[in-house]
Amino acid sequence: MQPSSIVVAGLGVLVLLARPAAGSQASQPTAPQASPQSAAAVPDFPGFTVKLTFSDKASNTLLARKETVIVAAYLWGYPKPGTPKHLIDDIGQVDLGEVKSEVAPDKDADFGDFQLKKDPLQQVDSRGPQLLINVFSGRKSSPNNLLDCGIYEGLLKSAREANIKVACKLIGE
């Protein structure tokens, strides 16, 4: 195995098979693929949906500007005692990766079932993988984010039942 493969495996890259909502576009996982030896899959995690709501002004602006919305799902975990330092990020978490779904402002973001890589997941403590959802504009009509949105944070295993809703308005609204 090449040294770069070891580093990639240690980063806790997430292998996701995200299925976007009908009429939406999903970006591929943002991290590089690890070698087959370190990419051993663990049990599936069920997919989940993020329901987006917008203020009238935000909705009208996004539609008029033909702007998209990006829903970013960041996965992480609390490290077990003795977790190798190379698996712990600068804020003390095990990075399990991220996936993004780009949707029209009138669509929900659907994330399909996926698997996490075995190596980093084995270093997560008994609380299990955590999920953080952030939402921002797709920057099609402006180089800057246009949206001020809430977040969602919770257990990954509970995401399907959590009925995740994120409300957005325009920045400064």
Q: Which residues make up each language-model segment?
A:
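Short coil-to-beta strand junction motifs in C2/discoidin
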Residues: L62-I70, S126-G128
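Beta-strand-rich domain onsets/edges
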Residues: A26-F48
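Tryptophan-paired
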Residues: Y78-D125
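Bacterial N-terminal signal peptides that target proteins for export
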Residues: M1-A9
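Extracellular beta-sheet/turn segments enriched in Thr/Pro/Gly and aliphatic residues
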Residues: G150-E173
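Beta-strand signatures of extracellular beta-sandwich domains
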Residues: I70-Y74, L132-N134
